[in-house]
Amino acid sequence: MSNKKADSKPQAKYPVNLLDTPFPMRGDLPKREPQWVKEWEERGVYEKIRAASKGRPKFILHDGPPYANGDIHLGHAVNKILKDIVVKSRNMAGFDAPYVPGWDCHGMPIEIQIEKQFGKSLPAAEVMSKARAYATEQIEKQKAGFKRLGVLGDWADPYKTMNFVNEAEEIRALGKIIEKGYVYRGLKPVNWCFDCGSALAEAEVEYKDRTDPTIDVMFPFAEPEKTAQAFGLPALPRAEGGIVIWTTTPWTIPANQALNLHPEIVYALVDTERGLLIVAEERVAACMEEFKLSGRVVATAPGVKLVNLRFHHPLASAHPGYKRTAPVYLGDYVTTDTGTGVVHSSPAYGVEDFISCKTHGMTDSDIINPVMGDGRYIESLPLFGGLSIWDANPKVVDALRDAGTLLRSEKYTHSYMHCWRHKTPIIYRATSQWFAGMDVTPREGGKTLRETALEGVEATAFYPSWGKQRLFSMIANRPDWTLSRQRQWGVPMAFFVHKETGELHPRTLELLEEVAKRVEKSGIEAWQTLDPRELIGDDANLYEKNRDTLDVWFDSGTTHWHVLRGSHKDQLQFPADLYLEGSDQHRGWFHSSLLTASMLDGRAPYKGLLTHGFTVDGEGRKMSKSLGNGVDPHEVANRLGAEIIRLWIASTDYSGELAISEEILKRVTEGYRRIRNTLRFLLANLSDFDYAQHAVPVDEWLEIDRYAVAFSAQLQTELLAYYEKYEFHPVVAKLQTYCSEDLGGFYLDVLKDRLYTSAPDSRARRSAQTALYHLTQGLLRVLAPFLSFTAEEAWKVFQPASDTIFTETYYAYPDVADADALIDKWSLLRDVRGTVTKALEEARTANRIGSSLQAEVTVHASGARYDALASLGDDLKFVLITSAATVVKVDDEAQEGVDVAASKYQKCERCWHYREDVGAHADHPTLCGRCFSNLFENGEIRSAA
């Protein structure tokens, strides 16, 4: 390492110890970082970490797999860098913390890409082949992006849900939950996307505003006598009229099969210009105003009295196909917040409607379900056959108007379900699907899936803690899980069903294992090409292959099975210590993983869940193409450096939204420069220091050096406690304060005189360097999890014989006697120094002095402050950075203060102190006595600073 002195003339005559370092002031991050990424890979740094960590307690952060489609975005960067910080910090804390990245490879988005590129008519085998190739290409692209961010992991062998072994193990997991009795087939309304042509998981649904027609419709009386009796009347005053419903989905009217009233809500029979109308009593005034009618309440009755009354379908007069009646059922979900207090039920298109109708005895075959998977009505539907339901909306309104049953229609903007992929509206649609029953008791007995999952939530640590209630509520209130999808590129539900009854083949579990063995060799294509006779012989006449695929959330939700205990079981273990994802994953990966592990293992697959927020711009707005406020991590890395992204993420409280803007990045960059400058100072001043040769024993250090090490050790204890809780922003904040104030603003500031002017091999200077050595050891290691490039760059200068900083553990600082007392004492001294600095500033502003070294100060102090100051003796001037300092004892705080006077002496050319002995040696008229001693004699003696 260079030991070059600065070349100005005075220093050539009277040299000071100004050393150089190959660690540059400018990071030049965009240029240097890719070189580090390449070097880490070539030197096998990740493998070296694994070798160094072997035998330690395991810590498993299980990677939630990003989808193998598209470039990485800022959300990916946040997620992967947070994971990287956790893994590196756990390795350095003495754990064996491997990181196996993964990718989610099956599902709709990739199918859509293949359809876009090659059309919709490809044979299934070709779709799969092209989907595999596409996913592989996308993975390589994303992998390069993650590596560029400084993320270390097993990039050579990541897990992929499309790897044959993972596909096979997923089929085995399906077999296990079938064996336990959780899986059943049933007709139920599920989230259905017409563009996907498939059911959607809850996590695949998003809500956006949509404007639809809202209508109030009258269902005419079908049983006037019974209706009169229900209201306590001998007869209805007039024949015309009926019960009124309000809906925002006119397209569901053709499939109406019932009406729902709340048993305790009071309903009114109102005489109006349009006949007798039944609405909730508390909605009468609002309804009359909306219908532009005047009305008189004839009678009232609670909903329970109206049960089983029947009313004609509102389109009965428009077409014979609608000549049916709708019975009144009771439902607690009916409210009077809006509408009429009466809900029309189309059981095929609403979960509550479906449950109500099934509860009242309706069978699956009774349910009218005229909407096909592509969103069009069946051709045979009267009046609207073949129409898209969205196109049919206005036509249904017109038909109701013509039939005389429409009371009101207007446009209504409401939050409505949309497909997260296609951004198009979706519906609830009753289809025959395979479900995992939330309230099913497993065959071996015990608790239901819901109960087990809720216990799993209770047993999990949440970071931040509010995540617990969120996940608990979602599990407590969710419906049964729709496991099946109607797609090609997915893991098959590879069993055989009876062609007539739909029952599973009696040898299903055995057959699933046979299929899994084939998939393990050839992938899911083995199921597609399988001739049923190969496995079930003549039973193929009675049974057919199930064509459904598994929900992709089952793919990723079973990674604890097919990765932790499957493809990567040699490195990983179950349960994982931590799952770490964005807050949307409470209804996504956290959720599906909890359900599958509850079914397979009766417990959660994780010990802890860490949730981070989403990225927003500087004004708190979500990032979107329309606003043009997106931030590309590649662009930032290439312009400012990935280190700046890492520092931004680490310094932000990820439990909320993470705001980013040019102004924020500018502040982060300034903070980075301060840290880098601190490291440069440390490395430069250690460049002629060999610990084995020059280290001074701790009990021989100067007092301020012992304080600095004790303070740094105490700080490290605080930092590691934050790392332990995955709270990184306090780590960054404290380290930035440490670099700028504790070191730069105090200790290093005081140290400069000793480092630069003491004899190179003096105890005073070597004491300072020994302390700096320990500080550098500690600082680089606590920086390494987030400032990975910079810490490694500095480490290679500091410890060139070491492979990498990432095989190190956190530093064990030497024990300093009376550390707490030292910290207290020097905290007090720093307070006094702050007061003195302020007085010096005032003197400088008044032009009484130039630099602080031109000053001589007298500090009037009492009590502990006096004792602390006096204990430093002549070294006090070095702490205050003045040429002379005197302390005078006073009786109380009221008498305390600082006197500043300009020195009457000459300035030493070498140390810049103003001293009486400048020129005491005739041959050196510009040199002070201590510099003469440091250069030509035994050197000055210091004890404190």
UniProtKB/Swiss-Prot annotation:
Biased composition (Basic and acidic residues): 1-10
Protein name (database record): Isoleucine--tRNA ligase
Subcellular location: Cytoplasm
Catalysed reaction equations from the record: tRNA(Ile) + L-isoleucine + ATP = L-isoleucyl-tRNA(Ile) + AMP + diphosphate
Binding locations of ATP: K625
Disulfide bonds: none
Pfam families in the record: Anticodon_1, tRNA-synt_1, zf-FPG_IleRS
Subunit structure: Monomer.
Single GO MF annotation: isoleucine-tRNA ligase activity
PANTHER family: ISOLEUCINE--TRNA LIGASE, MITOCHONDRIAL, SOLEUCYL-TRNA SYNTHETASE
Name of the encoding gene: ileS
List of residues binding Zn(2+): C908, C911, C928, C931
